[in-house]
Amino acid sequence: MPGERATGESPGEGSVLPLRRPPIRRSTTVRSDLDHVFTTFVRTIGVWWPLQPMSIGGDRARTVTIDEYTGGRVYETWDDGTTAEWGRLAVWEPPNRFVMSWLNTPAPTEVELAFTALGPTLTRVSVEHRGWEHLTEDQLREDCAAPGGYSSGAYSGGWAAALAASVAAIESTLP
């Protein structure tokens, strides 16, 4: 298969190495303390997540839920009560980070959200979406609701929009 070589074969003249597909990395800052940012991000994701167009159920999607424990589900709920799983929490370390499988791609990828205190009332929220090397070129173009998928930057733009929505929601809950 193009881009692959047999196990133990060393790269040499004429060999083809697999393309490296870099992770998507986005970050933002929130004017609030670490605990508030993490808790509000997780517990109100169903309020601020941009379900249109970033959901499995489209117009049927009503909310998003994160089960707050290792092994917990991240899922959306539709207007008829049906749930569609986005992934499972592989790491749960409040208030610093969580890592989840991402099942909304043809082959699972992984998303890490990290929360870092930059000061008493300033927190950085960073996302790294990785594992793109598991997808074919066609899957990379067709893997998300936005036209072009990974290959055209749709996921990068989607994560930027999600982070911006989270900042607005979190900062609106400040006293």
Describe the predicted segments one by one.
Residues 2-61:
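Hydrophobic ligand-binding cavity/cleft-lining segments
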Residues 103-157:
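Beta-strand/loop substructures that line and gate deep hydrophobic ligand-binding cavities in soluble
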Residues 23-29, 73, 84, 97, ...:
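Intrinsic-disorder/low-complexity, polar/charged segments enriched in Ser/Thr/Lys/Arg/Asp/Glu/Gln
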